[in-house]
Amino acid sequence: LDGQLEYVPHDHGFPNLDKDNNGLVPVHAVNIQSGLVFITQDEPVGPGALESLPDLLSDDQVLFDSDEHEDNINWKLTAEGTLEGYHIKPTHPESFFPYGYDNLNVIELQGPNSRVCFPFRRIEKLRDAPRENLSLDRMVTLVNRIFPFASVTRLAQHYNVSLAEPESPTRTRYFSYKLTLPIPDGGAPTEEILARAKKDAAFLSDTGNKEDAKVVSDIQAAIGSGANTHYQFGRFESAIGHLHRNLARYLAQLNEIEHSPSVPGI
C-alpha cells in the first residue's frame, strides 16, 4: 500500500485534480513490540513507551473478547486507579480485599512506563518454597502502564489490554481486549483454559470494574464542585507521580517545539 490516490468517482467534476499529490499522508513510523503496534503519526518528541518496554504478550495467547465504550470521565482518573493499592480495602471490601492486602504493592519504574504488582494473600504459600522454577502465576495481579494511554494487565486467569482515547477533558473512549494466559510450552489453549479465562473476566466485569467505575465517576463529578484546586497523592502512589512527571516532561518538550522559531530552509 503506497497511499496513492487511484480513483475518484465522477472524476470529470475535478478536472484539475493532481492525483499524485492528493494521496494518503504517510505516518512517521510503525513499530511492533511486545505484542503491541505503535503508530507514530508525526515526528516524536521522544521515545515514549518504546524507551524501555518489557516483553508483555506472546504469540500463543488467544483473543476471546473485546469492547469499546465511552465514559464521561478524564482518562487520567482511570489510569491513576490502576497504579496504587491504597484504594483496595475501601473500594473492594468484599470482592478483592478478602483475597489481597490493604495498601500493599511492589512498584517498578521502566522509563516512562511502570509495573504495579498487587499480591494475593495466597502468595504466602511461596514463602518456604524452593527458589527453582518459582512462579507468580495466579499469585499476583500485574498492571503494566504503557505510557501514557495503555495498560496490559495480567490477572489470575486472563490478560486485559486497555487503550484510552481522550476525546475531551471530561470524556474518554476506551478499547479493551481480553486474552488467555500464555501457555508454558507455547501450545494452543484448551477449552478448559478458555472457559477459566472467560469466567475470570466475567467476575471482574461484575465486581471490581463496576466498583472502580463508581469511584472514578464520583471523583469526576466532585471536580466540578470547585471545592478542590488539586488532589494530593501520598507516598504509596509513586507510580501515579511517575505518570504525571513524564506527562509534564513530554508536554513541556512538545510546547518548546511548537513555539520554537522555524529554521529557514527546513
Question: Where would I find each of the regions flagged by the language model?
Answer:
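C-terminal catalytic domain of Rieske-type non-heme iron oxygenases
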Residues: 28-266
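Rieske [2Fe-2S] iron-sulfur-binding domain
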Residues: 1-40
